[in-house]
Amino acid sequence: MIKKVLISLFILLCHIPLVHAEDFMNEIARANDLYASNNYQQAADSYESLRDRGFNNGHMYYNLGNAYIRLGKTGPAILNYIRAKKLIPRDENLQVNLNFAIQQTRDKITQPPPDTLAILFFWVNDLSLNEHINLAFVVNLAFWLTLTAWFYFRTDFLRLTRNLIFFLLLLAFVAISVKLHFESNSKTGVVLAKTVSVKSGLDASNITLFELHEGALVNITDERQGWVEVQLDSKQKGWIPKDSLGI
């Protein structure tokens, strides 16, 4: 597993009130120091405290996953690696550690293969949603600046530039729409319980269809009365208690 603790400029990457900035920075430094000194449980507790207070950062989730994998808690480790992947999708070390963690699980269930839409828009997942929004903002600004210049200087170069940037702007908005579709329609859960029985209905007395173990990745298809319906493939589907799963 790749060993990497990010001593952070996390604060620059998150939108948090300035009045809390110093507190967050101190807590990050404390958590990183605890991890560096092999106090993994205390480090994990500090990172979890930051998350509970609204701190949302891919590098923090990555470090939290590393702390849990050191503690042998593969379920929480995989859960936080997946959270990190949504925010820092191009981090190669993150993908290596996620693959390593999955190999430590009993079920060894990998992430589902991309569907047709994901294959067609393969480049969309290379950026986080925030990055797509920021990119669209920059392209939109460039378009209006170019359009303004074209009104004053109607040259062929500015006309072609305007049309090209307009096309890129449309592409940026399409990318945001596709990314939102991916995030709203693909709900992945991670089993946190050591073992959980997948039932045929919303009650513990129902038939056990199969069992899952800590760290198993599942697709959540429904939620009712404290239970969630999970699916592995077209044949393996059933209900488990919601509190046995991390989302």
Where on the chain are the PLM-derived regions?
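Boundary regions of SH3-family modules and the immediately adjacent low-complexity/disordered segments
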Residues: 74, 150-151, 156-193, 200-207, ...
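Membrane-embedded alpha-helical segments of integral membrane proteins
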Residues: 107, 112-151
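Conserved beta-strand/loop element in small beta-rich adapter and peptidoglycan-binding domains
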Residues: 207-223
